[in-house]
Swiss-Prot record:
InterPro entries: ATPase_NBD, Heat_shock_70_CS, HSP70_C_sf, HSP70_peptide-bd_sf, Hsp_70_fam. The lineage of its organism: Eukaryota, Amoebozoa, Evosea, Eumycetozoa, Dictyostelia. PANTHER family: HEAT SHOCK PROTEIN 70KDA. GO terms for biological process: chaperone cofactor-dependent protein refolding; protein refolding. This is Heat shock cognate 70 kDa protein 3. Residues 615-630 have a biased composition (Low complexity). The keyword Transcription does not apply.
């Protein structure tokens, strides 16, 4: 039973598989080992990955990215509202449950998709990439999420996997996966326990995890982070800087022009990467807006100044995990960098300064480490007996405190943050007033004292409590956190033995089973449409290839001398006629293209066969150029 590991990233995704006693990171159909987390819609087809990102400047409002910044969040969330200012695509609210929906034009119709559906399309692409490489279907996967993802975001990611027809064996934390990659790489090189800090700064999220690694046992001691900090935020600072510069130089504001903004953002992303290895980067965009060319440059020092507060925000979570573990900086044996944004020199400098100049560990590929670790975990969960991984033990923690609201709106923690998971914790509560017949259990996650400042996960009632003075009934509340970090809560009246429970996936914004079932059906329908479109284009290309193959044949000197003028005229007339039809009917159906090939072959083949029967030359065929098909 093959299982794959998928790093579902904000900007790029990556897939790996355990094969022949090692992890293989699988290249996509473009030969790239990471795939843009982009989905595009147009009048004829849906594009995913490189194909979607490559056309974004031409079709910005129907090209969706950053689904990870929407998944599991409410439309009214201030983070979502802020992000919407930077996105060219339209995000609307589902009025019933404050859930964000992405609106696009697809095949002439207005369609809406949930963030889970967009993420499922990216997951499907990664699944297909693995299946193409392995040559067999893949149904099982381990998917990674930021360590600081809350319960709703984890469940929504699991739902995305379900929509893409994957059995999600486990949701694991990204820095934990990276630690597996590091630990496996170093297995046997160091004896005894080592303390490793994983610093994971990606395209959209930031995590820090502190682990103890000892002879194949990986124990997460503490984790912290920011689910909304990464390379995209640095890009935003550059975009705003150059928008202001363009306005200052040319007295024109490009903020309202999505195509110009997208071209500028692509140039900013390129400049940011250049600044990791050079002290200055050029930005050159022809005819950016109103026919005006925009040629400018930026220094690394200016970039660092623009992003200084964001870079400094990376340090606080590091200090937090050290404090949570009651460890000083000298106790850390290795600082491992993960995520593309850790290539930024200023980020490396700040970490190094914090640890008094300690050398940073750059031994693992920052773009692939998370998928690598996920692939190892997938192999373990699938029962792989390889001696390299069979004895690995992984112990993770709950990233946020979990508790209930008690009198006065106070947060009473039942599972403190950094508790080892899976776990079950129980506390006993009682009634607040005499003869109280029911209690409302409101479940929250977060670190603030008052529940109003934390995140409500769900609520339920336990009723039928027998009349008794306040403080008499014994109500036992149990929190059960599974290996995915997803929570189940049970409340039991010890007198009546009455039990009520809630799986904290019934959160208001979460997809219902009915929603998921429909989305699975839609995904299958889109997959069929994608296949039909692929076959249609192949038939169109086959027809075009055949026409030019025939034209080349009748211009071959060996053939011209053997063909009568009338035969040559017939072939020329038919090929020209078919070519004109093709140019005017680019959107024709597969069967129409195939029929045109048959019609042309029925005229051309009898004529050319006279020549080919006596020669060894190959006849023109519809498959001459199939290797060039996309």
């Amino acid at each position: 039973m093959t299982s794959i590991g998928i790093d579902l990233g904000t900007t790029y995704s990556c897939v790996g598989v355990w094969l022949n006693d090692r992890v293989e990171i699988i290249a996509n159909d473009q030969g790239n080992r990471t795939t843009p987390s982009y989905v595009a819609f147009n009048d004829t087809e849906r594009l995913i990955g490189d194909a979607a990102k490559n056309q974004v400047a031409m079709n910005p409002i129907n090209t969706v990215f950053d689904a990870k910044r929407l998944i599991g969040r409410k439309f009214s969330d201030s983070v979502v509202q802020s992000d919407m200012k930077h996105w060219p695509f339209k995000v609307i609210t589902n009025k019933n449950d404050d859930k964000p929906l992405i609106q696009v034009d697809f095949k002439g119709e207005t369609k809406t998709f949930s963030p889970e559906e967009i993420s499922s399309m990216v997951l499907s692409k990664m699944k297909e990439t693995a299946e193409s490489y392995l040559g067999k279907p893949v149904n099982n996967a381990v998917i990674t999420v930021p360590a600081y993802f809350n319960d709703g975001q984890r469940q929504a990611t699991k739902d995305a996997g379900t929509i893409s027809k994957l059995n999600v064996q486990r949701i694991i934390n990204e820095p934990s996966a990276a630690a597996i990659a590091y630990g496996l790489d170093k297995k046997g090189s160091k004896s005894g326990e080592i303390k490793v800090l994983i610093f994971d700064l990606g395209g959209g999220t930031f995590d820090v995890s502190l682990l103890s690694i000892d002879d194949g046992v990986f124990e997460v001691l503490a984790t912290a982070g920011d689910t909304h900090l990464g390379g995209e935020d640095f890009d935003n600072r550059l975009v705003n800087h150059f928008v202001d510069e363009f306005k200052r130089k040319h007295k024109k504001d490009i903020m309202g022009n999505q195509r110009a903004l997208r071209r500028l953002r692509t140039a900013c992303e390129r400049a940011k990467r250049t600044l990791s290895s050079s002290s200055q980067a050029s930005v050159e965009i022809d005819s950016l807006y109103d026919g005006i060319d925009f040629y400018t440059s930026i220094t690394r020092a200016r970039f660092e100044e623009l992003c200084s507060d964001l870079f400094n925000n990376c340090i606080e979570p590091v200090e937090k995990v050290l404090k949570d573990c009651k460890l000083d900086k000298k106790s850390i044996d290795e600082i491992v960098l993960v995520g593309g944004s850790t290539r930024i020199p200023k980020v490396q400098q700040l970490i190094q300064n914090l640890f008094n100049g300690k050398e940073l560990n750059k031994s693992i590929n920052p773009d692939e480490a998370v998928a690598y670790g996920a692939a190892v975990q997938a192999a373990i969960l699938s029962g792989d007996k390889s001696s390299r991984i069979s004895e690995l033990i992984f112990i993770d923690v709950a990233p946020l405190s979990l508790g209930i609201e008690t009198v006065g709106g106070v947060m009473t923690n039942i599972v403190p943050r950094n508790t080892i998971i899976p776990c079950k914790k129980t506390q006993t509560f009682s009634t607040h007033t005499d003869n109280q017949s029911g209690v409302l259990i409101q479940v929250y996650e977060g670190e603030r004292t008052m529940t109003k400042d934390n995140n409500l996960l769900g609520k339920f009632e336990l009723t039928g409590i027998p009349p008794a003075p306040r403080g008499t009934p014994q109500i036992e509340v149990s929190f059960d956190v599974d290996s995915n970090g997803i929570l189940n809560v049970t409340a039991e009246d010890k007198t009546t033995k009455k039990v009520e429970k809630i799986t904290i996936t019934n959160d208001k914004g979460r997809l219902s089973l009915k929603d998921i079932t429909k989305m699975v059906e839609d995904a299958e329908k889109f997959k069929e449409q994608d296949q039909q479109q692929k076959e249609r284009i192949e038939s169109k290309n086959n027809l075009e290839n055949y026409i030019f193959s025939v034209k080349n044949s009748i211009n071959d000197q060996k053939i011209i001398s053997k063909l009568s003028k009338s035969d040559k005229n017939i072939i020329e007339s038919e090929t020209e006629s078919t070519l004109k039809w093709l140019e005017s009917n680019q959107s024709a159906e597969k069967d129409e293209f195939n029929q045109k090939i048959s019609d042309l072959e029925s005229i051309v083949n009898p004529i050319l066969s006279k020549f080919y029967q006596g020669n060894n030359n190959p006849k023109p065929t519809t498959t001459t150029f199939n290797q060039d098909l996309d």
